[in-house]
Design a protein with these regions (language model features):
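Central hydrophobic cores of alpha-helical transmembrane segments in multi-pass inner-membrane proteins
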Residues: 53-68
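Hydrophobic alpha-helical transmembrane segments
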Residues: 119-144
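Transmembrane alpha-helical segments in integral membrane proteins
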Residues: 137-157
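Hydrophobic alpha-helical membrane-insertion segments
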Residues: 83-102
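Transmembrane alpha-helical insertion/packing segments
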Residues: 2-55, 225-231, 252-287
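Extended, charged low-complexity segments
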Residues: 218-346
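Loop-centered beta-sheet repeat module
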Residues: 158-211
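Juxtamembrane "helix-exit" motif on the non-cytosolic side of transmembrane helices
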Residues: 37-44, 181-190, 246-250, 298-308
């Protein structure tokens, strides 16, 4: 999409009634924290609503701001993925500082299961395995999957349009800052830990580098699409699902090395496929579904943060599965309804 096209889309989006523009914003605000913390079984069913409400300003605010930045500038999915990675480092490195805190999971059910110390890098004070897990899940579950799902519910003419005007963006930015401050101030999460100045500067430098990379003009200069040849939606969906589950099961330095190679290959393959003229929203949704279904499957294999009986854990995991199925089924039905519209270029 050209810069002129993005500007015209912004003007068109601004003419829509406010309630119509706010529905997807609210949906993304609440879907992002659910996908980030609940979709993989992190919390019991009775706690999900509270978790979503408390974390919506931070996780949801970030998702909305990243989506608006990409759609307003025409940066598309490359920009979304890079900004999502920046958010992952910002969140884990500067806000809750889980990237550096060796005791971050000490009082949870993951304390006995974590193999993070086996891949700890003494100079940096991080676990390579946890860095991949924390940042990767923020990219896949907190940002990319929720954006793809919410946009799938919209008509094709609205998927690339901004949802908010400047005042709305300011409100969401303030919500994000307040939500982040709330998490940072919660000492029960950080357990009194504060990263060293060197760690904070290093994390901030990585975030800045990712933001600068995301802002490069090259993402707004799209080459002409290749001839038809994109795979059916099931193919990228299954590929993302297998990679998500496989990476989640790996541990140790060998697991870290394999994860980096496999994830890089996945990103390359999706980027290659998306360059074809017949790559559409169904493929985008299938890729998001692969991550969300992978998280729902993982929920049956890992415990929640807090102790729960086997029955409580199973009920919560079933709730997660049903919500994911309902959400994805509805999104797929909406895309099918509009599938006669020309292929999705984002």
């Amino acid at each position: 999409m050209t810069t002129h096209g993005a500007e015209r889309a912004a003007l068109d989006g601004g003419r829509q009634p406010m309630p119509r523009r706010l529905v997807p914003v609210v949906a993304l605000l609440f879907l992002a924290p659910w996908a980030a913390e609940c979709s993989w079984g992190g919390f019991a069913g009775t706690d999900m609503l509270g978790v979503v409400v408390v974390l919506a300003p931070m996780y949801g605010g970030a998702a909305v701001l990243i989506r608006e930045a990409a759609r307003r500038t025409g940066g598309g999915w490359p920009m979304i993925v890079l900004l999502a990675a920046g958010f992952g480092v910002l969140q884990a490195g500067l806000v809750d500082q889980s990237l550096f805190n060796p005791d971050y999971l000490a009082d949870t059910e993951f304390a006995e299961l974590s193999a993070a110390d086996r891949t700890r890098v003494p100079v940096l004070g991080i676990s390579a395995q946890q860095a991949i897990s924390f940042v990767g899940n923020h990219v896949a579950l907190t940002i990319c999957a929720p954006i793809a799902i919410v946009e799938s519910y919209l008509a094709p003419t609205r998927r690339l349009r901004p949802w908010l005007r400047v005042p709305g963006l300011v409100v969401v930015a303030v919500l994000y800052l307040l939500g982040s401050l709330l998490v940072f101030a919660d000492d029960s999460g950080r357990k009194g830990f504060l990263a060293s100045p060197g760690q904070l500067v290093g994390a901030a430098a990585v975030v800045l580098a990712l933001v600068v990379l995301a802002a490069l003009p090259r993402w707004r200069r799209r080459p002409l699409p290749a001839p038809a040849g994109a795979p059916r939606p099931t193919r990228p969906g299954l590929l993302v699902l297998l990679v998500y589950l496989g990476v989640s099961m790996l541990s140790g330095w060998i697991g870290v090395a394999v994860s980096v190679v496999v994830v890089a290959a996945l990103v390359w393959m999706l980027a290659r496929w998306s360059g074809h003229a017949d790559w559409g929203q169904r493929q985008v949704l299938a890729s998001a579904a692969g991550a969300l279904v992978g998280a729902a499957v993982l929920a049956y294999l890992v415990p929640p943060y807090s102790p729960a009986s086997p029955t409580q854990a199973l009920i919560s995991d079933v709730i997660v599965s049903l919500l994911a199925i309902a959400m994805l089924t509805g999104a797929y039905a909406r895309v099918r309804r509009h599938e006669s519209v020309p292929a999705y270029p984002g």
